[in-house]
Amino acid sequence: VASENRYEGTVGVSGNLPFLGTADVAGEFPTAGIGEILYGCGNGAVGITREGGLGYGAGYGGGYGLGYGGYGGGYGLGYGGYGGCGCGCGY
C-alpha cells in the first residue's frame, strides 16, 4: 500500500495488511509542528497462514513431460509440443 498524499492533523489508520509492514516519511516536517509514526502489530506474534491451494498435485511444470515446460523430452504433450527440462532455458 503506497500513498503520495499529504495528511495534516491527526490521522488514525487501522486494519490488516497481508505483510508485516513498513512506514516511510519523506520530505521535511515544518518547524512549527511535529510528526511521528506509531506502529504496532498486536502482541508481536506474527502468523502467516496458507489458504487454499491443491498441495502436491500435478501442477505447473511438475509433471514428467506432461505440464507446461515439464521434465524431460516429453514430445507431443508439453507446451509447444516439447516438454523441456523445466528450468525455462528452452532445452
Curated annotation (Swiss-Prot):
Disulfide-linked positions: none
Pfam families in the record: Chorion_1
GO biological process: chorion-containing eggshell formation
Region (Central domain): 1-51
Superkingdom in the source lineage: Eukaryota
A single GO cellular-component term on record: egg chorion
Region span, Right arm (Gly-rich tandem repeats): 52-91
Alphabetical keyword list: Repeat
Leader sequence segment: none
MF annotations from Gene Ontology: structural constituent of egg chorion
Function: This protein is one of many from the eggshell of the silk moth.
Membership in a protein family: Belongs to the chorion protein family.
Name of protein: Chorion class B protein M3A5
Record organism: Bombyx mori (Silk moth)
